[in-house]
Curated annotation (Swiss-Prot):
PANTHER family cross-referenced by the UniProt entry: FMN-DEPENDENT NADH-AZOREDUCTASE 1, FMN-DEPENDENT NADH:QUINONE OXIDOREDUCTASE
Keyword terms: Flavoprotein, FMN, NAD, Oxidoreductase
Protein task: Quinone reductase that provides resistance to thiol-specific stress caused by electrophilic quinones. Also exhibits azoreductase activity. Catalyzes the reductive cleavage of the azo bond in aromatic azo compounds to the corresponding amines.
Cofactors: FMN
Designated gene of the protein: azoR
Cofactor note: Binds 1 FMN per subunit.
Protein name: FMN-dependent NADH:quinone oxidoreductase
Molecular function per GO: electron transfer activity; FMN binding; oxidoreductase activity, acting on NAD(P)H as acceptor; oxidoreductase activity, acting on NAD(P)H, quinone or similar compound as acceptor
UniProt: FMN binding residues: 10, 16-18
Entry keyword Flavoprotein: yes
Family, per entry: Belongs to the azoreductase type 1 family.
């Protein structure tokens, strides 16, 4: 049985194109595999703990800085529970709108919580990072209202898909498909662009 984790990064519900496209992809996958297990993670409804003093200090113990104590261990247990949910997925699906050239802050918060040594990555002083999540894949729907590939710099920059590509590579997920719906506000026929993205996702 395949487990799919759908991460909802837009707060706009049914008005969000990234949500709608990701939903269509998940529905198509369900139609192809009746045993597919889908876990929906709405980052705007989830109670994500602050990654502040204790969890940050606990993380540093893996790099030889400081020591665990009961307070740090409690904070780290909360981090581990959230991270294990992500690690349990065979296929990660994200619908990600572009916010100010980057990703929504709730998604960055989530990534900062789960990107932990010994769980998502290893680190060696001589060889750098090594991703620990193997034999998994990801499908990422990226949307924007203004920026598009090849656009003049006056229309923004992409720290959106580029960041996510780097992050997936860092944690070991190299089978990543990006489907873009960009831009949605400046084209003469935005519906045609949406339909192309939808066709690519439902045919996958």
């Amino acid at each position: 049985m395949t487990k799919l984790l759908q991460i909802i990064a837009s707060p706009r519900g049914g008005d969000s194109k990234s949500n709608a496209l990701a939903d269509a992809f998940v529905a198509a996958q369900r139609a192809k595999d009746s045993t597919l297990q889908v876990d929906h993670l709405d980052l705007w409804a989830e109670d994500l703990p602050a990654f502040d003093g204790d969890p940050a200090a606990a993380k540093m113990t893996f790099f030889g800085v400081g020591q665990m104590d009961p307070s740090k261990e409690q904070a780290w247990s909360a981090v581990a529970r959230i991270t294990e949910r992500f690690m349990s997925a065979d296929h990660v699906v994200m619908g990600v709108p572009m916010w100010n050239g980057g990703i929504p802050y709730r998604l960055k918060h989530y990534i900062d919580i789960i990107t932990q040594p010994g769980m998502l990555f290893g680190f060696d002083p001589d060889n750098g990072y090594s991703g620990l999540l193997r034999n998994r894949k990801a499908t990422v729907v990226t949307t924007s209202g203004v920026w598009s590939e090849g656009a003049d710099a006056r229309f923004g920059s992409d720290f959106h898909s580029t960041y996510l590509k780097w992050w997936f590579e860092t944690i070991g997920i190299t089978d990543v498909t990006f489907v873009r719906y960009q831009p949605s506000l400046l084209t003469d026929d935005p519906q045609a662009g949406y339909d192309r993205a939808l066709a690519a996702l439902t045919a996958a």
